[in-house]
Amino acid sequence: MANILDYLDWRGDLTLSERAFNEVDNLILAEICYLDLSGFAPAGFDTQQVTLREAWDAYFAAHPTTDMGVLVPDQIPVLVQKAAQTARFGSLRLLGYVNRIDEETQTQFSAMTMLLPDGSAYVAFRGTDDTIVGWKEDFNMAFTPEIPAQRYAADYL
């Protein structure tokens, strides 16, 4: 059965201008934010931006192998590498990268914005990973009306 890696092989040569953004593209961009691009994607929203291809090249030069932990699939770096090398995603501009883990407040928050060729912005939020902080935050959601990461997400937008 085909998967999103196969989709990148099949449709990676088509830009988002040639074929409109679709559900599979949405899934791919959502998955990209699971790779920790701290130091490789700019934190600000000013004019400093890098392409996905540039961020991947810098990341891979620093981390030729990556352990994604228990919950996040090991295929994420493969997905990002494939996406970065395509005409469809390689030139997407990254900005606003945040990766905040705070043991004291039991908060895990990560987000990134990707600029699409039509001028729209795609915002991706990372979910829980396998850190103790992430698990504690999940448990806190069961009995706390609002956790810090929810406030961070609202502020991010």
Language-model features, listed with the residues they occupy:
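Non-catalytic, mobile gating and regulatory segments of ester bond hydrolases
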Residues: 1-157
